[in-house]
Amino acid sequence: FQLIYQSAGRSGRGKIPGEVVIQSYNPDNTVIDHAAKLELKKYYDVCLKERESLDYPPFSWIVKLELRGTKKHQVENSINKITNSIKQMPKGIEKLGPAYCYREKLKDNYRMQIIFKSQKKYDPVGTRLQKFYNSIIMNSKINVSKNPRLIVDVNPTSLL
């Protein structure tokens, strides 16, 4: 959205009217349409409704537990330890995964993740989610500084 919006906004600033050509496999996509027409408010409204229906921020808190290691089986064993240490999911907290990250191997490290979402109506400031993932880390008895390494990302900017 940002690049299309920026290109469309810069086109035709001078005396000569500009034109932006967008090549896409999905030209009817609302994101492309709103960006090309410089409809920031409409795009914002669509995204906000979509995030609300999926329970993504700003309507929830998210934490990503990512394991990275050079040996695939160690990463898998560690993520299974974390998963098995979860006895019961608290009300309002949802678990996604475990699963391999979008890029399973990055810089000679295998990567797996578990994502937890906490609904703000049950957890207004995120403390329930924080206590929950801290207890998981303690109960799973994983050494967070060894191979594989555990990375905790609270409200990640990307889930890839």
Question: Where are each of the predicted segments found?
Answer:
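Substrate-gripping "pore-loop 1 plus following alpha2 helix"
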Residues: 1-3
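Accessory helical-bundle/CTD segments and flexible terminal tails appended to RecA-like ATPase motors
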Residues: 6-160
